[in-house]
Swiss-Prot record:
It is found in: Nucleus. Residues 1-13, 74-104, 117-138, 224-237 have a biased composition (Polar residues). Residues 305-402 form the SWIRM domain. The modification Phosphothreonine is found at residue 235. Keywords: Activator, DNA-binding, Nucleus, Phosphoprotein, Transcription, Transcription regulation. This is SWI/SNF complex subunit SWI3. Residues 694-722 are annotated as: Leucine-zipper. Changing residue 392 to A: Loss of DNA-binding. Interacts with RTT102, SWP82 and the N-terminus of SNF2. Component of the SWI/SNF global transcription activator complex. The 1.14 MDa SWI/SNF complex is composed of 11 different subunits: one copy each of SWI1, SNF2/SWI2, SNF5, SNF12/SWP73, ARP7/SWP61, ARP9/SWP59; two copies each of SWI3, SNF6, SNF11, SWP82; and three copies of TAF14/SWP29. Involved in transcriptional activation. Component of the SWI/SNF complex, an ATP-dependent chromatin-remodeling complex, which is required for the positive and negative regulation of gene expression of a large number of genes. It changes chromatin structure by altering DNA-histone contacts within a nucleosome, leading eventually to a change in nucleosome position, thus facilitating or repressing binding of gene-specific transcription factors. It holds the Pfam family SWIRM. InterPro entries: Homeodomain-like_sf (IPR009057), SANT/Myb (IPR001005), SANT_dom (IPR017884), SMARCC_C (IPR032451), SWIRM (IPR007526), WH-like_DNA-bd_sf (IPR036388). It comes from Saccharomyces cerevisiae (strain ATCC 204508 / S288c).
Length: 825
């Protein structure tokens, strides 16, 4: 039964591990205990006795008697089992503890079916003898657990048991540590459980001890042995009949518990295999288990981030008031998708993405691909960050996106098209082919009945006569109308006589009443030459103020003045040509010879186009009066054809010249305006030139002042040098006089021939000094030694050569800054 006991101990250990939450530790302790690790010397002696008992052990069949339910064991096993009872008496039986855990504890503690501590399990396994198992146990794979009951002497004294219990409570501290994890013992709970089991054993199930201190067995252990079909009995005696009823109840209860144990065994087998692998590779050193914290995703900074100084208010963790004012849509709390949190997420994403590589342009498209939200809001946020230099500030200008525009087409040629009768407004361009001027002159000749202009004027006169003078039936009526012509002009005609379009009317219909033009009554042909001169003079003086012009004339109204001015011909055909008025040659074309230069030369009929243009600038009523005047002129010319005269119409020539001059006077204000503009331009130009001339003189004066200031400074410096030289001369002269007087005194005091060598040397030295002072007089300078003292470093060496020392002379920028400014310029 060695394998069976080993499995049973493993089951006890695994169940106990479920109670304390240390499955791996308890299984490792169990494996270490089975491997033969003993805690005390007593355990070593017991293991030696087990080996000796196994040698003499005989096979005992494990048979079950249904009637007596007794289990027999060989007599050779009794001493070994009795010796092991001392170690097992401090703990209750395995089956009793399991029953107590099942029926006396909560459901959460139902996994700990054996109620033993880890130390007791390991000790029981170490002290349990090896008992062979039968083939039935191996087939059913059920552990045969030996029941260890409490040991009592013949007098019923349990003092020895308490001593052993106290000793055993101290032993868990010496248990083996596997994989560096220390077991945690629970002496309080185990002691409580053992006390309860001992009380139940003493009251109910007192075992009977044979004279040789062998246990006949107790009820609970026997019931467990019957349930597992394999057990160990302490004596070959039978179970008392008084306990059969309790035995049957316990068997039924333990079967339900065994089912739970079987389900836990499958799980424990897997844990056992894992722990066996760990136990093989376990080291005696304690290992520490450390929790690995998840690594934070941080990217080291690889670029220097630069933002403009005016954006130092920006902070990634806060929202500034500038942002609230620039993008208020995120801070109104009206739109759920636009909140300050969403704004910070958008903003920080753009800023962080840009700062990963500040040399690359961060576009709006990149933000839209990675951030979900309003595209317009993202665009405004991107524009705001770019404006303040928070993004795209370090990007090279060559990498910035450029506006894609179509190529320029200014060099393309274009062709202008216009409707007929219109012309493009462009500068003068002479036509390639000149028109037929003779034909044009013939068309403009009003004296020729075949000309187009004559026909047009005649037709206009006919229509006008039909409107103003309807035909009458009798001559009397005509006479009355002629007498009362002024009255007819002021009334509206309601005549239904036939007019030019009367044929278009049906019977019973009348044409609309025609209104007479009131301006016709203002026409006055009684203009004298003095009145015309006053009119032209008034136009020259007052221009278009016709009230003043009429006042200047005196006896005419403003309307009459206007009509008379319009009746004046602009050009006269007698002013040009040979004076015969025919204009057959080219010299008689007059202004028409310049027709190709007019802007109407490209039209089909330039004459009519010119007339239409000029007529459009005048009041229609005025045009009508001018037409009437032209018709009257044509009739007078026709009547004069019969009277051929060789004399030239001098009066007409004079009148034409006056008209031309008056027209020029009328248009003089236009030329005056142009001249006034030209005068203003010339005046401004003259003022500008005078100002430039004045500025040039002032600049020249400033230069002269600077030059005079420089000369003054130079003169002051020369005066200072002269004064220094005078002082130096006086000083040197006094020194020379002193030396000379000293030499003379020496010579006079003693005769040179009789003097000693020392006196001669002194005289010689004084003479040499006198020579040196005469040859090289002392000079004052601006250096460190201005008076050339012998003990101070000077600019001369011992050989008399001057040495330039830069430290002796100050630079010009320090000594005279005003001169340095002029020289540097």
């Amino acid at each position: 039964m060695e394998n069976t006991l080993g499995e049973g101990s493993t089951v006890n250990a695994s169940v106990d591990v479920d109670q304390h939450g240390n499955d791996n530790n308890s299984d490792s302790n169990a494996n270490a205990a089975v491997a033969g690790v003993a805690n005390t010397d007593t355990a070593g002696e017991e293991s030696q006795q087990q080996d000796e008992s196994l040698k003499d052990e005989a096979t005992v069949p494990n048979t079950r008697d249904a009637e007596s339910e007794a289990i027999t064991v060989t007599a050779k096993q009794q001493p070994t089992m009795q010796a092991n009872k001392l170690d097992s008496q401090e703990t209750p039986s395995t089956e009793e503890s399991r029953a107590q855990n099942v029926f006396g504890q909560d459901n959460e503690d139902s996994d700990n079916l054996f109620g033993e501590t880890e130390s007791s399990v390991s000790n029981n396994e170490a002290n349990t003898p090896s008992i062979p198992t039968n083939p039935v146990d191996n087939e059913n794979n059920k552990p045969a657990i030996k029941e260890d009951s409490t040991i009592q002497d013949s007098n019923g004294d349990v003092k020895n048991m308490e001593d052993v219990k106290i000793q055993k409570e101290e032993e868990p501290e010496n248990n083996t540590v596997i994989e560096g994890v220390k077991e945690e013992s629970q002496p309080d709970e185990n002691t409580k459980e053992m006390d309860e089991v001992e009380e139940d054993d003493e009251d109910d199930d007192q075992p009977m001890i044979s004279p040789d201190n062998s246990i006949f067995g107790d009820t609970k252990s026997e019931s467990k042995q019957l349930g597992n079909t394999s057990s160990v009995a302490n004596t070959p005696s039978e179970i008392p009949d008084a306990h059969k009823a309790e035995q049957e109840d316990i068997i039924e209860k333990t079967e339900s518990v065994d089912k739970k144990v079987d389900s836990g065994e499958e799980r424990n087998e897997q844990e056992r295999e894992i722990m066996n692998d760990h136990s093989k590779s376990a080291n005696p050193k304690k290992t520490t288990i450390t929790r690995v914290e998840p690594e934070t995703f941080e990217i080291p900074q690889a670029h220097e981030i630069v933002i403009p100084s005016y954006s130092k208010w920006f902070n990634l963790e806060k929202i500034h008031s500038i942002e609230v004012q620039s993008l208020p849509e995120f801070f109104t709390n009206r739109i759920p998708s636009k909140t300050p949190e969403v704004y910070m997420r958008y903003r920080n994403f753009m800023v962080n993405s840009y700062r990963l590589n500040p040399n690359e342009y961060f576009s709006v498209t990149t933000a839209r691909r990675n951030v979900s939200g309003d595209a317009a809001a993202l665009f405004r946020l991107h524009k705001f960050l770019t404006k303040w230099g928070l993004i795209n500030y370090q990007v090279d200008s060559k990498l910035l996106p450029k506006n894609i525009e179509p190529p320029l087409t200014s060099q393309y040629s274009t062709r202008h098209d216009a409707p007929r009768g219109l012309f493009p407004f462009e500068s003068y361009k002479p036509s390639v082919q000149l028109p037929d001027m003779a034909k044009l002159k013939k068309m403009m000749n009003t004296s020729d009945s075949e000309s187009t202009l004559y026909k047009y004027l005649k037709e206009s006169k006919r229509k006008y006569d039909e409107i103003t003078h309807p035909p009458s039936t009798t001559d009397d009526e005509n006479g009355d109308k002629n007498d009362n012509g002024g009255k007819m002009n002021n009334e509206v005609s309601t005549s239904t006589s036939m007019t030019g379009d009367a044929n278009l009317l049906e019977e019973g219909e009348t044409s609309r009443p025609l209104k007479k033009v009131k301006i016709l009554e203002q026409i006055d042909e009684n203009w004298s030459k003095e009145d015309l001169q006053k009119l032209l003079k008034g136009i020259q003086e007052f221009g278009a103020d016709w009230y003043k012009v009429a006042k200047n004339v005196g006896n005419k109204s403003p309307e009459q003045c206007i009509l008379r001015f319009l009746q004046l011909p602009i050009e006269d055909k007698f002013l040009y040509g040979d004076g015969n008025g025919k204009g057959d040659n080219d010299n008689g074309l007059g202004p028409l010879k310049y027709a190709p230069h007019l802007p109407f030369s490209k039209s089909e009929n330039p004459v009519l186009s010119t007339i239409a243009f000029l007529v459009g600038l005048v009041n229609p009523k005025t045009v009508q009066s001018m037409t009437q005047r032209a018709i009257q002129s044509a009739e007078s010319i026709k009547s004069q054809k019969e009277e051929i005269s060789d004399q030239k119409p001098i009066e007409h020539i004079k009148e034409g010249s006056e008209i031309a001059i008056s027209s020029l006077g009328y248009r003089s204000h236009i030329f005056a305006t142009n001249e006034e503009r030209q005068m203003n331009f010339l005046t401004n130009e003259l003022i500008r030139l005078q100002m430039e001339k004045l500025d040039a003189k002032l600049n020249h004066l400033k230069k002269l002042e600077k030059f005079m200031e420089l000369e003054r400074k130079t003169l002051e410096r020369q005066q200072e040098n002269l004064l220094i030289q005078r002082l130096n001369f006086n000083q040197n002269s006094s020194k020379i006089v002193n030396v000379l007087s000293k030499c003379l005194n020496l010579i006079s005091d003693s005769n040179i021939n009789n003097s000693s060598v020392a006196e001669k040397e002194e005289i010689r030295s004084q003479i040499d000094h006198f020579k040196s002072m005469l040859s090289k007089p002392e000079t004052l300078s601006i250096g460190k030694n201005p008076f050339n003292k012998p003990n101070i470093e000077t600019g001369e060496n011992h050989n008399g050569q001057s040495i330039s020392n830069e430290n002796d002379v100050k630079p010009i920028s320090i000594e005279a800054p005003q001169f340095y400014r002029y020289w540097s310029a």
